[in-house]
Swiss-Prot record:
GO terms for cellular component: cytoplasm. Mg(2+) binds at E261. Coiled coil: none annotated. Its main location: cytoplasm. Pfam families: Phe_tRNA-synt_N (PF02912), tRNA-synt_2d (PF01409). This is Phenylalanine--tRNA ligase alpha subunit. The gene is pheS. Its cofactor is Mg(2+). It comes from Streptococcus mutans serotype c (strain ATCC 700610 / UA159). Tetramer of two alpha and two beta subunits. One of its GO terms (molecular function) is catalytic activity, acting on a protein. Its EC number is 6.1.1.20.
């Protein structure tokens, strides 16, 4: 049998074998492919006979070889698809799902009450034209204390109150450093600065029902021309009404903070008794909610802001305290213990 006849016979016999194969013959298919098209396969052996052909027949037979290779390659690919489809079908049949079985309820997590409070407060201030600015939790001593008018010998620098990492690096005790950095960069030719800076802060406190070594604060700052105590009071009245009810009133009591002058403690009329006196307000009719004041001129000057031309106010409130007051929570540790029975109450 001449070479051309052998090529035709190889094509026909291989196609016939492939046609007889079922989808379950994956290994047999691979073995046949190697036997026919492999480096030592039948087609390769026939190719060796080209050198013995007359010169005029070599191109003709060579073309036939390529045609047979292409036809068989395509045939093997088609059969491989059949085998793969059969494999998938068998897998589906063996893993059939019973769609009549009742579904299993997926337990969803709860948004933490502190996240809810924080977002609510941020939304209130965003609606008043404030910007929200984040900052570093690991802070320089300079920004945490000196820029807030807290000199080296101030009691707040005591090692018992602050987590120092090194002599000049610490875990921030408030979010005020964010305000200082933002004040440094603000362009007052474009208008006043109105910002809040939410985030975690750290103190060397012993954890108990009312204290935690870490907690959350939102501090606010407004600086511009002709900013007055009346602007501060109006802002505080707005936040108290939004958080505790439209019929709430506030009062300002003189206080002291190094970075504000004058400084005030802010009380809100008790939302449980309406100011008549109860166990929540300790019979006073008022509940302390935050501290505030007019920005100290020294704080402005350290940012290169002319305190003769510009003034401002600042305030700081704690999300934990806001949540405890609103929901009657009596132990701050509940916020951090990860107990779903606690967090799911505030959905």
């Amino acid at each position: 049998m001449d070479l051309q006849a052998q090529l035709e016979e190889l094509r026909k016999s291989t196609q016939a074998t492939l046609k007889e194969m079922s989808g379950n013959h994956s290994k047999e298919l691979q073995d046949l492919r190697v036997k026919v098209l492999g480096k030592k396969g039948s087609l390769t052996e026939l190719l060796k006979g080209l050198k013995d052909l007359p010169n005029e027949l070599r191109p003709v037979v060579g073309k036939q070889v390529n045609e047979v290779r292409d036809v068989l390659t395509k045939a093997f690919e088609e059969q491989a698809k059949i085998v793969e489809a059969a494999k998938i079908q068998a897998q589906l049949e063996s893993e059939t799902l019973d769609v009549t079985l009742p579904g299993r309820q997926i337990h969803l997590g709860n948004r933490h009450v502190l996240s809810q409070i924080s977002e609510e407060i941020e939304d209130i201030f965003l609606g008043m034209g404030f910007q929200v600015v984040d900052g570093y939790e690991v802070e320089q001593d300079y920004y945490n204390f000196e820029r807030m008018n807290l000199p080296k010998d101030h009691p707040a620098r005591d090692m018992q109150d602050t987590f120092y990492i090194s002599e000049d690096i610490l875990l921030r005790t408030h979010t005020s450093p964010v305000q200082a950095r933002t004040l440094d960069k603000h362009d007052f030719s474009k208008g006043p600065l109105k910002m809040i800076s939410p985030g975690r802060v750290f103190r060397r406190d012993t954890d108990d029902a009312t204290h935690s070594h870490q907690f959350h604060q939102i501090e606010g700052l407004v600086v511009g021309k002709n900013i007055s105590m009346g602007d501060l009071k109006g802002t505080l009245e707005m936040i108290s009404k939004k958080m505790f009810g439209e019929d709430r009133k506030i009062r300002l009591r003189p206080s002291y903070f190094p970075f504000t002058e004058p400084s005030v403690e802010v009380d809100v009329s008790c939302f449980k008794c309406g100011g008549k006196g109860c166990n929540v307000c300790k019979k006073t009719g008022w509940i302390e909610i935050l501290g505030a004041g007019m920005v100290h001129p020294s704080v402005l000057e350290m940012s290169g802001v002319n305190s003769e031309e510009y003034s401002g106010f600042a305030f700081g409130l704690g999300q934990e305290r806001m949540a405890m007051l609103r929901y009657g929570i009596n132990d701050i540790r509940g916020f951090y213990q990860g107990d779903s029975r606690f967090t799911e109450q505030f959905n």
